[in-house]
Curated annotation (Swiss-Prot):
GO terms for molecular function: potassium channel regulator activity; toxin activity. Negative results: does not induce direct hemolysis of human erythrocytes and it also does not induce potent vasoconstriction. Belongs to the three-finger toxin family. Short-chain subfamily. Type IA cytotoxin sub-subfamily. Monomer, or heterodimer with alpha-cobratoxin (AC P01391); disulfide-linked. One of its GO terms (cellular component) is membrane. It comes from Naja kaouthia (Monocled cobra). Monomer: shows cytolytic activity (apoptosis is induced in C2C12 cells, but no cytotoxicity is observed on INS-1E). In addition, this toxin shows insulinotropic activity that may be mediated by the modulation of potassium channels (Kv). It induces the increase of intracellular calcium release. It induces insulin secretion from rat INS-1E cells in absence and in presence of glucose, without affecting cell viability and integrity. In presence of glucose, the insulinotropic activity is increased, suggesting a possible synergistic effect with glucose. It holds the Pfam family Toxin_cobra-type. This is Cytotoxin 1. Expressed by the venom gland. Keywords: Cardiotoxin, Cytolysis, Disulfide bond, Ion channel impairing toxin, Membrane, Potassium channel impairing toxin, Secreted, Target cell membrane, Target membrane, Toxin, Voltage-gated potassium channel impairing toxin. GO terms for biological process: killing of cells of another organism. InterPro entries: Cytotoxin_Cobra (IPR003572), Snake_3FTx (IPR003571), Snake_toxin-like_sf (IPR045860), Snake_toxin_con_site (IPR018354), Toxin_cobra-type (IPR054131). It is found in: Secreted; Target cell membrane.
């Protein structure tokens, strides 16, 4: 997950209220993101799932 890049093609701006970009990985395979998108609060990691969050609404 690359944060704070301002490349228009690759960047994503989140809707109001969900101003953090995140990626979700399964702990069994940290190389392939399962889900990505915008969220209001960065979730905590669990035994099965790891979250990687940006502190901005732009990511690629």
């Amino acid at each position: 997950l690359k944060c704070n890049k301002l490349i228009p093609i690759a960047s994503k701006t989140c809707p109001a209220g969900k101003n953090l970009c995140y990626k979700m990985f399964m702990m069994s395979d940290l190389t392939i993101p399962v889900k990505r998108g915008c969220i209001d609060v960065c979730p905590k990691n669990s035994l099965l799932v790891k979250y990687v969050c940006c502190n901005t609404d732009r990511c690629n």
